[in-house]
UniProtKB/Swiss-Prot annotation:
<keyword id="KW-0793">Thylakoid</keyword>
<comment type="function">
    <text>A factor required for optimal assembly of photosystem II (PSII), acting in the early stages of PSII assembly. Also plays a role in replacement of photodamaged D1 (psbA). Assists YidC in synthesis of chlorophyll-binding proteins.</text>
</comment>
<feature type="signal peptide">
    <location>
        <begin position="1"/>
        <end position="25"/>
    </location>
</feature>
<dbReference type="GO" id="GO:0015979">
    <property type="term" value="P:photosynthesis"/>
</dbReference>
<dbReference type="InterPro" id="IPR028203">
    <property type="entry name" value="PSII_CF48-like_dom"/>
</dbReference>
<protein>
    <recommendedName>
        <fullName>Photosystem II assembly protein Ycf48</fullName>
    </recommendedName>
</protein>
<dbReference type="InterPro" id="IPR015943">
    <property type="entry name" value="WD40/YVTN_repeat-like_dom_sf"/>
</dbReference>
<keyword id="KW-0604">Photosystem II</keyword>
<dbReference type="Pfam" id="PF14870">
    <property type="entry name" value="PSII_BNR"/>
</dbReference>
<dbReference type="InterPro" id="IPR016705">
    <property type="entry name" value="Ycf48/Hcf136"/>
</dbReference>
<dbReference type="GO" id="GO:0009523">
    <property type="term" value="C:photosystem II"/>
</dbReference>
<keyword id="KW-0602">Photosynthesis</keyword>
<comment type="subunit">
    <text>Part of early PSII assembly complexes which includes D1 (psbA) and PsbI; not found in mature PSII. Binds to the lumenal side of PSII complexes. Interacts with YidC.</text>
</comment>
<dbReference type="GO" id="GO:0031979">
    <property type="term" value="C:plasma membrane-derived thylakoid lumen"/>
</dbReference>
<keyword id="KW-0732">Signal</keyword>
<comment type="similarity">
    <text>Belongs to the Ycf48 family.</text>
</comment>
Length: 333
């Protein structure tokens, strides 16, 4: 029996099949400029930073009180243990401005250094602090901004002795947050149904519902006022103006993966890298128009949780089981 399809339906199916075929043919990178680095831990790595005074002096933080130090730009790492830090401490974020650095984590953890980490002191946080520290940003001598996992934002100008609220009301549980170049924030609600935008002049969070049927996983800022958004199901969307609330139709680069995308970062104005579960790493050389995959890394038994660039030639990928990858080009190999 022949089945005659309605033409619009036939067109939709044709487009769907074409998209799947194109996805299946995502080219593989001929040269993968990433090198796995051995680190002395099997714990989850959560954040990385380098000091502003010695660019080769870096620090890694993670769960289970993980604190690692490098003196050679991230090639080799050594464990640093701090007295008084509980074994189950969750060190979520680290940031430096010059020689001054900060580490924020849970439960109610805030560490401070004035000498590139040679000495760390613990700063007591008020038990009434809404939520737990999720992100810390060093801003200059004595100054830093801290965000909790319910969207409370606080700033200090005196080395952490006093903190001043920067937002009138928190927003409830969030799972991911990113800070923009001028102090803006994009935060994703814990269930991924909403995202929120904060700008310093507003003192409030503005909510936006998800536009896709898939929940939001993560968000971040791009060059020149742009932003990216990762949805569950390996979707990516873009906007040229992160304050507009208007996004492109979601893309699904690559074949239909069982692993989702978890984080992304721009290397420069046009090179975009996306990481995800199952050692997923894809790259776009043109801001999201075309894509290629780093299939060579798929044998690494870890999820890639985050990626960060400190300049076009210095980048790192962090993941579970102590997984660390370093960007390697002809200039820093």
């Amino acid at each position: 029996m022949r089945v005659k399809m309605f033409k619009p339906l036939r067109l939709v199916l044709l487009i769907a099949v074409s998209v799947l075929l194109m996805a299946a043919r995502m080219p593989n990178m001929r040269v993968v400029p990433w090198q796995q680095v051995e680190v002395p831990t099997q714990n989850i790595l959560l954040d990385i930073a380098f000091t502003g005074t010695t660019p080769s002096h870096g620090w890694l933080v993670g769960d289970k009180a993980t604190l690692l130090e490098s003196r050679d730009g991230g090639l080799h790492w050594q464990v640093r243990e701090l007295p008084g830090l509980e074994p189950e401490a969750y060190l979520a974020s680290i940031s430096f401005a010059g020689a001054e650095g900060w580490v924020a984590g849970q439960p109610k953890i805030l560490l401070h250094t004035l000498n590139e980490g040679s000495d760390w002191t613990s700063i007591r946080l008020n038990n009434q602090l809404p939520g737990e520290p999720l992100l810390i940003q060093a801003l200059g001598p004595g100054a830093a901004e801290m965000v909790t996992n319910v969207g409370a934002i606080y700033r200090t100008e005196d080395g952490g002795q006093t903190w001043h609220a920067q937002v009138d009301e928190p927003i409830g549980a969030i799972k991911n947050i990113a800070r923009g170049p001028e102090g803006e924030y994009l935060a994703v609600s814990s269930r991924g149904s909403f995202y929120f935008l904060y700008t310093p002049e507003s003192r409030t969070w503005k909510p936006y519902p998800r536009e896709s049927s898939r929940r939001i996983q993560n968000m971040g800022f791009g060059p020149h006022g742009s932003a990216w958004k990762l949805n569950q199901g390996a979707e990516i969307a873009f906007t040229d103006d992160f304050t507009s609330g208007q996004w492109s139709s979601p893309l699904r680069p690559g074949r239909a993966l069982s692993f989702g995308y978890l984080n992304a970062a721009y290397q420069n104005d046009h090179d975009l890298w996306v990481v995800g579960g199952g050692a997923t790493l894809i790259h776009s050389p043109d801001g999201g128009k075309t894509w290629e995959q780093a299939k060579k890394l798929s044998n690494i038994p870890a999820n890639f949780y985050s990626i960060e660039f400190f300049g076009p030639e210095q980048g790192f990928i962090l993941g579970q089981r102590g997984t660390l990858l370093r960007y390697v080009s002809s200039n820093n190999s």
